[in-house]
Every structure is written in structure tokens, then in C-alpha cells.
Amino acid sequence: LRAKLTFTARDGEGILLPLHYNHLLQHLIYHLLPPDFAENLHEEGFRYGKRRFKLFTFSRILQKGRFRKIEGRRRLFFPQGFSFCFATPRYEILENLIREALLRRSADLLGQEVFLSRVEVCPEVELREVMFLRFLSPVTVYRTTKVEDKRRTHFFSPADSEFNQLLLENARKKYFLVTGKSANGLKFTIYPYRFSPERNKAVVLFKGTPIVGWTGVFKVEGDPELLEVTYQAGLGNKNSAGFGMWEVWEDKREKEQAGKE
């Protein structure tokens, strides 16, 4: 279940955001849900052992903002408003979001009144056992340990052997929460395809905390039903903070070449 949400400002004034805006989009999503539903989703979510999953994700803003310097800080300005994609495997989340958002229509975003001007439900896609995906928001996977009473977080890169395994373990937990079935027999493997460790590394500040993620195009092989859950809920960690959303990617040059043959 996916939708593209478009927000505009009053009288075409445009919308101004900080460079690191994930927490603001998350706030916007929760604000546009019914209050009781939003509180339960945020505080409880869907439990798997000690872990709690929100089972939704969202993309980066789809438009390129214009840089502006205000009070010595760089900001992003969106003169025509902005759009982002939202996904969830839970029908009730998307239903509540769209219904409540259409009723309210407006929300406060850093003192700016923004309006939900358009909702586009995305068509379903067919997922295959072998395909390519492109991240619409950085994928992050990490492990937190305690060293001398201090919590330390180690972020893994696609070059690390644990990267794929941790993504798989995370996806299996989400699969169980969505379907109620064990995913122990299901698997997938992900390989960098069009990827550069320098160009595709993304460090996002989320409420002041740096989170390391990765963008780019990857090849994935695995069970479509497991991939379907990650398509709707996101790959990796921090999905509800705007990480791990992906789309099916096709090499246009290869398609054009095949059409000529």
C-alpha cells in the first residue's frame, strides 16, 4: 500500500525546511493520523519480542529544494511545495492517514501552515525473484553495543558481510508481524549494482543524532513474498524515521538496446 502525498503552502508562499528534515516529515505523518491511533502507533506499534515496529516508511522529498541561507544556516526552499511517498503493509494505517488528512487538510510545519493538496495511491507492482531496486530513502542497518556503560552504535555498509544478514533478519521479523507466519524458510540476498561508497553514503541527522545510510541501485535475489513486506514496510532499521524505502528499478539503456535488436 503506497501513496504519494503532496503539500503546498498558503497563497503559494513556498515551504522552508532544514537540510535534515526526516523528523519533520515523521511529525507530519503522525499529526495527520487520528490522535488516539497516532499515539498508539508511536508508543506501542507492533511488538516482536522486545522490539517495536511501526510498519511504515517514507521517502525523501521528491523535489529538489533551492538552497537559502537564513541566519547563517542553509535551508531548503520548495517554492511549489513538496511531495513524498508513504508506504505501509497495514491497510488501517494508510486508510486512517488519508481519511484524517483529507478532513484536516492543513498542518503546522515549523510555523508554516501546509496543506495536503493531493493524494495519489500508487499502482501495485510485480516483484520477481531477481530484480533491481533503487532506494528512495537511505537504507541503514546497525548494531548497538554497550562498552563501559556507554551505548555505541556501529553502522554497517554494503561491503560488510553482516549487512545482508541483518537486513534479512529484520525482514523476517516484519514478515511475521504482517502475515503471522514464520519466515525462517524465506530469504533474499542483496548486492550493490550502481553504487559508490563515497557518492551513495548518506549521513542524516535525526533529532540531532547522526544516522548513516546508503542509497543507490542494488540487485536483489530472493522470495517475492518476503521482498513484498520490505517494499511496503521498508528495508533495514529506522523505517518510520524515513529510511529504507525502495522502488523497483529498470535499466532504461538495456531496455532501449533490447528494443533495437
Located regions from the model:
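RNA-interacting cores
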Residues: L1-E261
